[in-house]
C-alpha cells in the first residue's frame, strides 16, 4: 500500500470518533482557529456572491463555519463543495450536511473546472498530501484570478523554551494516549506529531505557495505557534 493510501485508510478508521476527538484534544481551539480564518478571508475578499470548496474537508467542520461566516459578513454562498479522499470521513459529513455536495477525491487531482472558485480552503490537511506541490498547482488552477486560498495547518515550532517543551510533551505523550482511548486507534494519533515534525517551516511553505502562483496576503500564528493560518491570492 502506498503512503497516501495508508493515510487515507487511517482516516477511514478514525472517522466515527473524529469530531469528538478533535474537540477534546484541542480543547475546542480548532473551532476558534477555523472561525478566525473564515472571517478574515471574508473581510479580505470583497465579492458578495461566492463559490467555495473545502479540500480535505473531513467531516465537514469548515463547511458549517463558512456558512456561518457568510451570514455574519452578509455574503451569499452560491455554491459550496466538500472534497476529501476518505470515504469514511465523507459518510459522516453527508449525515451532518445532507444538502451539501461532497466529492471523494484527492487534493492533487480535483474534479473541478478551471477558474471556477472564489475561495478554496484546506484545514489541517495539506501536510497529509504526499504530492503537495501538485495539489498547490491544482488549487491555483481551480481558483479565479484574485481568488483566495486559505490554509490552516500545524507547523514546526520555531522557538524553544518552556511553552515549546510543553507543546511537544503534549503532542508526543498525552495526545496519542487520549486519542487512542477515544478512537481505539492510538497509532493514528501517534502519526499526528510525526507528521507535524515532518512538515515545512512557515518560510518554506510560503515559498511553495509563491512558486505555485500565489501572493501572500496574511499570516497568523495561533496558540503560541501550535497552528498557523496562511491566506494567499491567486495571481
Curated annotation (Swiss-Prot):
Catalytic reaction equation(s): a 2-demethylmenaquinol + S-adenosyl-L-methionine = a menaquinol + S-adenosyl-L-homocysteine + H(+); a 2-methoxy-6-(all-trans-polyprenyl)benzene-1,4-diol + S-adenosyl-L-methionine = a 5-methoxy-2-methyl-3-(all-trans-polyprenyl)benzene-1,4-diol + S-adenosyl-L-homocysteine + H(+)
Residues where S-adenosyl-L-methionine binds: 59, 84, 123
Keywords: Menaquinone biosynthesis, Methyltransferase, S-adenosyl-L-methionine, Transferase, Ubiquinone biosynthesis
EC number per UniProt: 2.1.1.163, 2.1.1.201
Associated pathway: Quinol/quinone metabolism; menaquinone biosynthesis; menaquinol from 1,4-dihydroxy-2-naphthoate: step 2/2; Cofactor biosynthesis; ubiquinone biosynthesis
One of the record's GO molecular function terms: demethylmenaquinone methyltransferase activity
Tree of life domain: Bacteria
Disulfide-bond pairs as recorded: none
HAMAP family registered for this protein in UniProt: MenG_UbiE_methyltr
Family note: Belongs to the class I-like SAM-binding methyltransferase superfamily. MenG/UbiE family.
Role description: Methyltransferase required for the conversion of demethylmenaquinol (DMKH2) to menaquinol (MKH2) and the conversion of 2-polyprenyl-6-methoxy-1,4-benzoquinol (DDMQH2) to 2-polyprenyl-3-methyl-6-methoxy-1,4-benzoquinol (DMQH2).
Name of protein: Ubiquinone/menaquinone biosynthesis C-methyltransferase UbiE
Gene of this entry: ubiE
Amino acid at each position: 500500500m502506498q503512503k497516501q493510501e495508508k493515510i487515507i485508510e487511517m482516516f477511514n478508521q478514525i472517522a466515527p470518533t473524529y469530531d469528538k476527538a478533535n474537540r477534546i484534544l484541542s480543547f475546542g481551539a480548532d473551532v476558534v482557529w477555523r472561525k478566525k480564518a473564515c472571517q478574515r478571508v471574508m473581510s479580505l475578499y470583497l465579492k458578495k456572491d461566492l463559490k467555495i470548496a473545502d479540500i480535505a474537508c473531513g467531516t465537514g467542520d469548515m463547511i458549517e463555519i463558512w456558512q456561518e461566516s457568510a451570514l455574519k459578513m452578509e455574503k451569499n454562498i452560491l455554491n459550496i463543495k466538500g472534497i476529501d479522499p476518505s470515504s469514511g470521513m465523507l459518510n459522516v459529513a453527508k449525515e451532518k450536511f445532507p444538502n451539501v455536495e461532497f466529492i471523494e477525491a484527492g487534493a492533487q487531482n480535483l474534479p473541478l473546472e478551471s477558474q471556477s472558485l472564489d475561495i478554496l480552503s484546506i484545514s489541517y490537511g495539506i501536510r497529509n498530501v504526499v504530492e503537495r506541490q501538485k495539489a498547490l498547482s491544482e488549487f491555483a488552477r481551480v481558483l479565479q484570478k484574485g481568488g483566495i486560498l486559505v490554509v490552516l495547518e500545524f507547523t514546526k515550532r520555531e522557538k524553544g523554551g518552556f511553552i515549546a517543551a510543553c507543546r511537544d510533551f503534549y503532542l508526543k505523550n498525552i495526545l496519542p494516549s487520549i486519542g487512542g482511548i477515544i478512537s481505539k486507534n492510538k497509532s493514528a494519533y501517534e502519526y499526528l506529531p510525526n507528521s507535524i515534525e515532518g512538515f515545512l517551516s512557515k518560510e518554506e511553505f510560503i515559498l511553495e505557495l509563491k512558486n505555485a502562483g500565489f501572493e501572500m496576503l496574511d499570516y497568523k500564528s495561533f496558540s503560541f505557534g501550535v497552528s498557523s493560518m496562511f491566506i494567499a491570492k491567486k495571481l
